[in-house]
Amino acid sequence: DTSEFDPLANKEYTEEQKQTEEQEQKEFLSQTTTPALEADDGFIVTSASFAQSTPSMSALSGNISPDSQTSDPITKAVRETIIQPQKDNLIEQILKDLAALTDRDLAEQKRKEIEEEKEKNKTLSTFFGNPANREFIDKALEKPELKKKLESIEIAGYNNVHNTFSAASGYPGGFKPVQWENHVSASDLRATVVKNDAGDELCTLNETTVKTKPFTLAKQDGTQVQISSYREIDFPIKLDKADGSMHLSMVALKADGTKPSKDKAVYFTAHYEEGPNGKPQLKEISSPKPLKFAGTGDDAIAYIEHGGEIYTLAVTRGKYKEMMKEVELNQGQSVDLSQAEDIIIGQGQSKEQPLITPQQTTSSSVEPPQYKQQVPPITPTNQPLQPETSQMPQSQQVNPNLLNTATALSGSMQDLLNYVNAGLTKEIDSNKQIDLIKEAATAILNNEKSDIAEKQANIIALAENTVNNKNLKPDAKVAGVNAVLETIKNDQNTPNLEKLKMLEATVAIILNSENLEPKQKQQMLEKAVDVGLSLKDDASRAVTIDGIKDVVIKTNLSTEDKGTMLIAVGDKVNVSELSNAEKQKSLGSVLKKGVEAQVLSPAQQQLIQQHLDKITAEQIKKDTIKKVNDILFDPLSNTELKTTNIQAITSNVLDGPATAKVKGEIIQEITNTVAGSSLEAQDKAAIIKGIGETIATHSDTSLSLPNKALIMASAEKGIAESQTNLPDRELMTKGLVDGIYEGKGGPEITKAVSSGIDNSNINDSEKEALKKAKDAASEAALDRDTQNLTEGLKGQNIEEHKPHDDIYNKAREVINAVNPVIEALEKSKEPVVSAEERIVQETSSILNNISKLAVEKVNNFRAMLSPNGNLKTLEEKKEESIKKVDELVKAFGTKSSTEEQQSFIKTNLIDDKTLSKEVRLQTIDKLLQEQKRAEAIENPSVKTEDVRVVSGKSKLKPISKDNPDIEKAKMVVGRDRVNIKGNIKIMGALMNARDIIQSENLNKSTPIKRE
């Protein structure tokens, strides 16, 4: 009995046969396809006399049709050349995966299940139809090699069928290209008349090209494709004009509306087989899978992803429903191709979904076709596949065999809840449970027969049902309620204020539930807040968040839990993308309501206040940097004016109410902005110097020394982390240190610069370079201070009357203090020293103490500034200077001619600025002394006014005629005269060099004037 024989299930393939078949497919493609040739629509018709019978079997369900109707050779060829090879490859991959499975017992069980079913000469439909095997099938289909192979089989199979059964190959009534004819009235409408081989008309096909507003579809890898043109074909449902069979094979179009090349073509084929009355009946549909629709309305066009490309099919969702209903009525079956969903009928839709942009509007969810009473119930093993439909991408699609929410809702909301609960009980996969809940929510909001109030009530009932459903695990309840909330968020038809009512009621149900733990309640609450924050207009967002806060306070939660929930609301607001002004307003409301309701602990209040402070600081920072940029890019202001203005901004920041840490962050942004500007490096360094001086000189009462150090470290960090080049950063670091010295900043402030470098996010070599720049600036500043002190002491003219001279004033203080003591001693008749002698002794002691104190302070200052010991003490520097002077004098002595000596003086004493001014002057003095001693030996009787030598005797001279009793505490330097002859040129050169060096700029910076 051929009706009970399945030649496909009986067909076994050895490895060698499979390889041979694959090779034949490749050869077939290379011989029969030409990439440059465009694929054509085709059709094949036969009369009753040509119809050949084969068993009518569902390659997807494995069941013979109840009435034992037969199918023609075309259908058989599709199954044999496409479906079965795809199945074989899929099973082969599943067996490979089972061999690698760690659970050996399960692997062996499944392997035996497959082998035993094969032995019964079946097409493994039981294995494919078992939901427990879905994970093995899905895993196999994740292999890119398998997907590519299945697509290759499909393309080769269609080419094979179309060529084998083509009219060109001599097959009676075989496939031939459709000859479309344009309608005279419209260029986008075409038609063709299909006749059987006897010349009788079977039907008229109408094709419409739709040029639509572009909409976007998402591919599996997440990339998006725009569709602006596709076509629709009005496939016939009932045919009663003439006898025969008909197969309509329509090529899928590319995203741009053009036909692909033949080597990439896939087809949507409708199989009309001769029925009992001789008329064609729609028995099967061959379509590449997963089949998807660009929307939920009946006019949504079908599309597929094949070989990484998007193709549109010439069938709408409404037409597909009609055709599938007719297939079922005619006891036929859909033939699904290409991927897992192509082969395993009744196990649900694929995981990919299209992304529909706002340009593509969608209507309400599709209601499944209503079948006549005599049609048996559709089961998972014989139900036609429901195609995918979605408005947004998601990770998992709901099982269409469980979901009929729109139909259930057409009765009553209770019917829908009963239906959903039955599905939740039956389905153990939590992902599918969640999808069922989401689909129910979508059906509620898309129900055109319901008004807003009814939709709100139904959504609230669904949320409550989800929370209280005992068949849902806690995590599934969270995900289910969140799915309802997400559906509310994505609904485009419900006004925002009406959404608010749904959100408030849902939050109340969640928080008052006794079936949820606090953690789960918080997760759902956070999702509700997210939905509120996603609303487009400011007013709706504010009202929604306030409403949710009110609900939290009014619930039956404990005081502690209410505080926790309010903090969760505040945290969501704080991390949102709202403007700072909106965040401040919303967080301020959370704090105010929480304090008034006495549900926030002091720690929680402090946390919210910290959020508010940070937002305030961010806003201040943003505003400040805008002002700084305006100043930097002002073409009418010079560097001095820019510096003054930025100093004023810096001062305002330091005087502000923010914490020292926040002030430091703002100052860091300022220096970083200056450093990254397009100004010249010298100009940027000058501005940075002004910032450093402003920080160093800021009032200690409003900004403590540790806080100054913290802010100064931040200032340097802003420089160090700027994107400008390293030499510029080094120069600006020096500028910052110079600013500190100009502002008389202490060593703690200078050391903070090193701290800022250490804490910056730069590499070690850059840190080392910046530290060297900082130390060099500190060294130079100390040298200037020391030199200024030395010059100040040297510059005091003892011969002139200076009533305000430091030493004179100190001497007067000593006299005033000593006189009463002397008078008391004289009265006691004890021997005393004269007043003059006492003054000399005291003054000498004071000078000595001043000298020691100066040396001690300088050395301590250097030690504090250089924790790593890389700044030398004054004694070390003096010893180093003496050594360098001796080296220069010795080197000078090696020059024999006057010209060489003059050149040495210019090169090493005048031009070499790397030597300190002090070393060069000491060298000149020593060389002059040597030159003059030599001349004095030659002519000891001749003296000159130009040479000063220390006299062998000391004598104190009166300060002035008005004060004859007070003598200056310094030895008088006598003058000798020597003869200047042979070395006059050298001595002249030395003295000229001395004058040049002494007139050099001491690099003193002019303090910035403040208004």
Curated annotation (Swiss-Prot):
Biased composition (Basic and acidic residues): 12-27
Subcellular location: Cytoplasm
Residue stretches of biased makeup (Polar residues): 348-373, 380-396
InterPro entries assigned: Rickettsia_antigen_120kDa
Residues making up the signal peptide according to the UniProt record: none
Disulfide bonds: none
Record's keyword terms, sorted: Cytoplasm
Region (Disordered): 1-37, 54-73, 348-396
GO CC terms in record: cytoplasm
Cytoplasm among keywords: yes
Domain of life: Bacteria
NCBIfam families named in the record: Sca4_fam
Protein name: Antigenic heat-stable 120 kDa protein
Organism name: Rickettsia sibirica subsp. mongolitimonae
Lineage, opening ranks: Bacteria, Pseudomonadati, Pseudomonadota, Alphaproteobacteria, Rickettsiales
Gene encoding the protein: sca4
